[in-house]
Amino acid sequence: MGIYQWRDKKKPSGGKRRYYYKVKRKYAAGRPPTYTTLSAAEEEERKPVRARGGSYKIKAKKVAFAVVSNPKTGEARKARILRIVETPAHREYARRGIIVKGAVIDTTLGRAVVTSRPGQEGVVNAVLLEEQGQKQ
């Protein structure tokens, strides 16, 4: 079991934390993060992963396009992602080109904020920022 999601140490009611000896369970196992990056070419790479309960998550490894919606008109269009401007989650992600929820991206339609979780949903959905939406 590589990544483990449970607490390894348990705090008893009136004392310090000590190791909690319990059998590891399969449902407590985790996976390394996906780190969805911007694809240099127009080809995209996705990987299905079995989730708990037999369902599947689609993990996007490399993406080139985003579904960008305009809040003023309510229409959504497919746009090419040009670059990642900033990522509030972690400064290093923008430098490495990793797309996460909340990241600000430059698209062919303008600057937008990512609203989906590409590492778990397999698609990049974004909403145009207000200053860009007024110019169009």
Curated annotation (Swiss-Prot):
Alphabetic keyword roster: Ribonucleoprotein, Ribosomal protein
InterPro entries: Ribosomal_eS8 (IPR001047), Ribosomal_eS8_CS (IPR018283), Ribosomal_protein_eS8_arc (IPR020919), Ribosomal_Se8/biogenesis_NSA2 (IPR022309)
GO function terms (MF aspect): structural constituent of ribosome
Any one GO cellular component localisation term in the record: ribosome
Superkingdom of this protein's organism: Archaea
GO BP field: translation
Subunit structure: Part of the 30S ribosomal subunit.
Family: Belongs to the eukaryotic ribosomal protein eS8 family.
PANTHER family: 40S RIBOSOMAL PROTEIN S8 (PTHR10394)
Record-given protein name: Small ribosomal subunit protein eS8
Gene coding for it: rps8e
